[in-house]
Amino acid sequence: MQVRRRLAALPLSTALTLTAHAQPAPTIADEAAAARANALRNQQVQQQHDAEQREATVQAPAVRSTVPTDGAYPTLRDEQPCFRVDTFALDVPATLPDAIRENGASTLPLDRFAFAREWLDHYRGQCIGREGVAILAKGIQQAVLSRGYVTTRVLVPEQDIAGGTLSFALVPGVIRDVRFADPVTWASWRSAFPTRPGDVLNLRDLEQGIEQMKRPSSQDADMKIEPTGAPGESDVIVSLKRAKPWTLVASVDNSGSRATGKLQGNLSLGLDNPLGLNDVLSLGANQDLYFADEGLGSHGFNGSYSVPWGYWTGSLFGYTSTYYQQIAGVNQTFVSSGNAQTAGVKLARVLRRSQSDVLGAYLQLSKRFGASFIDDTEIEIQRRNNTIIEAGLTDRHYIGGAQIDGTLAYRQGIGGLGATPDPNPPTPRPTTRPTYRYRMAVLDFNLSAPFAVASQPFRYVTTLHGQYSPDTLFYVDDLTIGSRYTVRGFDGEQMLAGERGFYWRNEVQAPLGQSRQSLYAGVDYGRVFGPSTAFLAGTQLVGAVIGLRGGIASKYGGLSYEFFAGTPLYKPSAMSTSRVTLGFQVMAQL
């Protein structure tokens, strides 16, 4: 078995001494070249992973039910006779069962119908007649429906309002039962729905449940609400359609680098409902396709598992990357290699749902490991054992046919869970040396909006990603631009990097009839800032891209593809990149 040796990191002013070898030892310049290769490879892997996560967020299933919106307060006209009303009452009739009456009680610590009582208080002190009472009853019912309480009713009991009090009867709509349309369905609605029998029926809770049941790609769900014989009670009937519970996807693309293999093959297996909890398990592997070339190569593995519980979703994830390449050193050509592993856990929760908005939050904890080698000799300064915590807010908003997805997060490297200290010695000014214990703010924004020109449909898609850190970072944590995942039009062999920066991608898509194909054209811009940029010839990139996306479906599976060509529009003169970058991805799914 071959034993790897460690190469200690010394100051640049110190000579590097190694035990005797049959061939010349790597120099400090060789070590620096290997470090750059390792950092570049790690950035490429991280860019691809982040792009896939953002795409998954944008493409996540959404369930939206249409209910009347709560309009402005209606105006009461002058009428005779009318009576001044100083007090409004919104109470549950005493004739209803105790369980239903408790759900509408105004004495609850969190009165779910407090908004309705506040709505009525807007009319306190006004003179109200028969027509005014009808207007208020309709308006308060509209307000209740707009909040998702679609089976809750507001009625006007017989009364005399001459005493200055106007009473309304609130009949809370509750869930008697949740069941599947097919009684033999093997599935769990409890892991998906945040509500239970006996709870007040709110359409937003039901939307969340159906959305969670749609997470497995092989599963589609729908629901209907059926009234029962009892006042205020309804049954929720869930219809479930399923295809095969597994998905096998194979793809080929040219997203790699020349040093470790441009052509990359990917194979992934998805398992839906392995535990019957609307959970999803995904396993994958990737490998360069230059099997006969022993001088370069890369491969990796990835996996994830997620399970919902009402408004909560828990996830486990991990991915690895290994590469090797030949680098021409000062005295010899040597093999530079490296590996990286990332694993983490994420807990997300929906905080609020409405007809046009879903607000959420998440907390993520991850571990990151890595090492770099020259001819099987480890470069200790490149060894990583980091712990990173991240907390963020997410939001999905709809404006007409447009969809907006956004994330604002805070990320920080911490010292727990065995994380090793920074490899650099302390200095009087810690911000002048790179650190893995950084503080960082991250922003993601995506807008997808349809429009038409002369009856030809188009879609405009814009994506903005940015990060800000007051610290000096190692290259693996820098924002880099100049690849198919950031600013398109560049081949990704050289990229600009900085502690702070952003890139803005813009794309117009034109579907080709009903062929499931679309042409697209885009212009992207990116810029980096920070201490690291002092050594760059420039900090801005502009690139353009045109391409074709499409797919072919069959009863056995499907084939999807993308072909594109990009070119730089602006770059630093010293930056080397292809005049035209051609890219493709072909994916087959069973």
Predicted regions and their residues:
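C-terminal transmembrane beta-barrel domains of outer membrane proteins
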Residues: 23, 120, 426-590
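Periplasmic polypeptide-binding modules associated with outer-membrane biogenesis and secretion
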Residues: 23-256, 262, 268, 285-299, ...
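Outer-membrane beta-barrel domain signature
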Residues: 130, 199-200, 254-260, 290-294, ...
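Outer-membrane beta-barrel architecture
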Residues: 211, 237, 268-270, 302-304, ...
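Transmembrane beta-barrel strands of outer-membrane/channel proteins
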Residues: 225, 250-254, 267, 281-287, ...
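Residues that define the transmembrane beta-barrel architecture of outer-membrane proteins
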Residues: 232, 261-265, 297-301, 339-343, ...
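Repeated loop/turn-to-beta-strand initiation elements of outer-membrane beta-barrel proteins
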Residues: 246-248, 275-281, 310-316, 354-359, ...
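Transmembrane beta-strand segments of outer-membrane beta-barrel domains in Gram-negative
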Residues: 308, 313-473, 531
